[in-house]
């Protein structure tokens, strides 16, 4: 897995957790069928409760100090063991063949998850399994309780499907039937509480329009033009490593298991000392029999400070950055697909407040058209306002790709004597990505990686070369010597879309990309630039220290110095004379 927190002062308004996962299935198991009259809809998995009622609309509400008292029901409660059972059941090929259509229970609960499966439906809410008594029909219909699936099966396959569910100890109940008349009907306690025409639902409600007044970015805050002179390189370098969005988050990352399923190709931190932060999540496709060399790749791109200055630039470079990280890992950019997660301040009738989502989505659209790559999904929230505080305009781009494991490279520096080269992503006169130029360079870099000319690579962000080469070096305790003729302003300047590469000295001349030679890998652990030298200890202390008190990487306890204070002292110790098993592992399991 891959875990990362992004910091900006305005996220004090409301934090947001976003994530993405990838699934895989054999092509032969992918079927597209329609729901026919008489088909049965089965509710599979967890029970329904009051948790999650109003969650969909709640995600776009303004919150105040009183929200904690009145919004508790909007929060769903997960149930990981049930989720795992559903995954295991759906992985069975014979199960996939009898499912005609399926839907997960997200926003809107039963009314949406089941309501989307066919034009005509009759749903019996009394049959929906409940966590406890007392829920009325409306609550059952709109609850967003998690770990539930709705599947459409042929009547002759119902018993077979219920048998498969029973083998996984999953509750599965037929709750609805597909009807010929195109109406959505919900019944509760023998009465119809909803009876709506499908034609009416298909109108998507009343037509709405709004006026948008686009705010032009201020020249004064342009990150690309702000290139102040660097007076003290060492102080600036250490300050960069200590930045909240650069520093080590290893204490946080280690709270999550990066080895689930034994398919991880990249651990969150790489190198002999596990200190080089990886930029992509790479894992083998899980197979039940045999072995595979196919891997899935996922990366993200987003910078809150760039987006705060210009949502258009922020979204365009979010897409570009997510592509760059896949390319730096060895992926082929031409196979990438995106999914976007958006998060903006609360919209009102003020035309200027609509400027942020309008500009950001326009920038993301321009990037997709520029790369010729589509976004196949996304999710948004318009609730990022707390009283007078608004979150930064947020459009996070997730890029996904597939590759062969032998084509993937890791980001930590490999060997002293190798050269460091810099691929610059070309920009136009408006400081926007030159997509044609970038694609040309990324294509050449991909070929160079496959040819073994590049042994590690790192995509740059707002913090430039200094942060990237330092992180690359930490993993194997190597050093970096930067060319003295490199402009210090370039060393710390934002480099969205740029990539730093480690290349064996004898292969630098064979590169097909356009590059700048910026330095060399050393074995002394030092970071040097002209007359400036930073020891490995100084660099790591700056990088690790910022969040150590928040996300600890050491326990802070010295067992040898702990005073012994026996609460009870036994005169005699009694041992069972019969031999008993000695457990070596204790695994507690707590269903959520």
Per-segment meaning from a language model:
Residues 1-592:
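Glycine/proline-enriched, intrinsically flexible loops and inter-domain linkers
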